[in-house]
Curated annotation (Swiss-Prot):
SUPFAM superfamilies, per the entry: Adenine nucleotide alpha hydrolases-like (SSF52402)
Keywords for this protein: ATP-binding, Cytoplasm, Disulfide bond, Nucleotide-binding, RNA-binding, Transferase, tRNA processing, tRNA-binding
Catalysis performed (reactions): S-sulfanyl-L-cysteinyl-[protein] + uridine(34) in tRNA + AH2 + ATP = 2-thiouridine(34) in tRNA + L-cysteinyl-[protein] + A + AMP + diphosphate + H(+)
Provenance organism: Geobacter metallireducens (strain ATCC 53774 / DSM 7210 / GS-15)
Annotated site, Interaction with tRNA, chain positions: 135, 345
Stated name of the protein: tRNA-specific 2-thiouridylase MnmA
Function: Catalyzes the 2-thiolation of uridine at the wobble position (U34) of tRNA, leading to the formation of s(2)U34.
PANTHER family assigned to the protein according to its UniProt record, in alphabetical order: MITOCHONDRIAL TRNA-SPECIFIC 2-THIOURIDYLASE 1 (PTHR11933:SF5), TRNA 5-METHYLAMINOMETHYL-2-THIOURIDYLATE -METHYLTRANSFERASE (PTHR11933)
Region (Interaction with tRNA): 157-159, 312-313
Gene: mnmA
Keyword RNA-binding assigned: yes
A Pfam family per the record: tRNA_Me_trans_C
Amino acid sequence: MTEKARKRIVVAMSGGVDSSVTAALLKEEGHEVIGISMQVWDYSKFSAPEGEKFDTCCSLDDIHDARRVAEQIGIPFYVVNFEEEFQRLVIDDFVDEYFRGRTPNPCVRCNQRVKFELLLRKARELGADLLATGHYARIERGGDGLFHLLRGDDPGKDQSYFLFTLTQEQLARVTFPLGGMTKPEVRQLATRFGLRVAEKGESQEICFVPDNDYVRFLEDERGAGQLVGEIVDRAGTVLGHHEGTYRYTVGQRRGLGIAHPHPLYVVGVDAERRQVIVGPKEELLAPGLVATDVTWVIALATETLEAACKIRYRHHPVPCTVTVLAGNRAQVRFREPEKSVTPGQAVVFYHGDEVLGGGWIDAAMTEG
């Protein structure tokens, strides 16, 4: 590698196999690599069962793993404490959304407000040319000089959904070395590099709710016994009572605690009225949605476009028509009705493999 091609690159290291391989690959290519882990949460508040570890990223054990990998491959390593910022920018938003009757996606918020904002700023302070992460997504620069955000090549691991808020300025300073690889290929590289984390399991839970008990977490943050009220159907008939609207999400069937001759699902949550609205499976279907805080990776030249959209991470993209509205809003009409359109989740728009942009689901449309 020529000195001109050699770059100083900060790698966001979580202690997992993906970010570890990212760092090792860039070091092998001849770049000047600096590893950084983010301390975002006080894990002393939780204790895993004896002999077990939580399936999260960013715990103290994970930071220790990242430090050992950095030592192994011979790169400097730092820990930045973003606990205060993470509480304000991610956790408070997470709690607020649940108490508004919505179901948030904190991983998108973390990418948007912490990883590709605060950590990217820290990388620039260190004189880095680029920030690298282990995300399974790709960035390509077009002939027009603009950066295009694309799906990762591994369809089972593609994480482009979580990255829709990235701007042109951010994409110019970010790299995703694993975007063209599959997970098995990444593990093979980890083995070739001799990394201790080669067989480390996947992080499954939200990092600040390591036991996956959302209700306990929310009540620890805001107190129990709030937003208690009625379970009703669409007509307003009272079918039962609940212990807090934040315990429910659209599509939920279990835990309703009401007897009914037919299966009932949560079809809406009205925190203002303290009501959980239930109905048969058919009432989960919606012809479209309205999204707010919509952003575009590349500015649109039209007010209406045909695209495919995902309304949750594991959702298969479906054809839709997007109409841009005033105030960074958009109306999304599906070609066929979709199930469980959930306020608070992200809707992300695609054209083939390319991420066009996305926003936050504000409401499901009810008319045909």
